[in-house]
Amino acid sequence: MADGNALPRSSFNRHRDAILDMFGIIIDCDPKTYCYYISNPEVLGDDSIERWLFSTLTVHGVLSDSVAIKGRVVLENVPAGVEFLDTIIRAIKMNKKILMTYQRFGAESYEKVVAPYAVKLFHQRWYLLSHTGHHFATYALDRMLALSLTDEDFEMPADFSPQAYFAEYFGVLTDDTPMAHIVIRAHNWTPNYLRTLPLHTSQHEIATTDHYTDFSFDLRPTADFLGQLLSHGDGIEVLEPTDLRQKMKEMIAENFKRY
């Protein structure tokens, strides 16, 4: 039905084909009940681009129908650098290297030719995972000053997975920090925040009382992960490993000196 009227089969099939093309979602019909269903629901997994696109377009549709209250919908600023996203996506599709002008915080700008392997959205910023010819490097799109396609081809190894590359890390900061089994204690309302928005795919709830909840993680505790823990203030306490607990104490002590 559409606005109370029957939807022509040809229109339905066009919509179904468009959904398949845009989201990779297959809509099949059960010959016994004549009911339609999604035959590959796994594509809507939590980390899939299909789920992200679906959620984004759903929100877009809701807001488009709510122009009358646009002044009552408060959004975050769109991060800089998104104007380069289209060129990067085209380069990934075509397996073409890109030439970019990049400027790190507090440094001079420079030009670099890299092979674009993947893009990642993290905390409202887009990042490019690339290979320089010698090593992997991650670049923030909001620190790119210029970007263009080159005529130079590249080939990403068939066994390389961007998801696997980032799997052991909290965000986009990747280094040789050793893997660790981390146990934290969440106080007050913090456990509810962690349950509804886990910090990492390895997060597990291992103990719960009336006063606190313990969570475990298996990842590389890079600086951005520690910063995330600190952002919860006294709501999070690191229990294990002991060296990480000591490091957190030192970071808190240094921060305390500023006050």
Where do the language-model regions lie?
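General beta-strand recognition
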Residues: C35-Y37, L99, Y127-L129, D214, ...
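Polybasic (Lys/Arg-rich)
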Residues: A167-Y259
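Core beta-strand-centered patch of the WYL/Sm-like small regulatory domain
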Residues: G71-V183
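A structural signal for short hydrophobic beta-strand segments in well-ordered beta-sheet cores
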Residues: I27, V119, L147, E205-I206
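Bulky hydrophobic/aromatic content
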Residues: D17, F23-G24, D28-Q103
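A short alpha-helical element within helix-turn-helix/winged-helix DNA-binding domains
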Residues: M1-D3, V119, P241
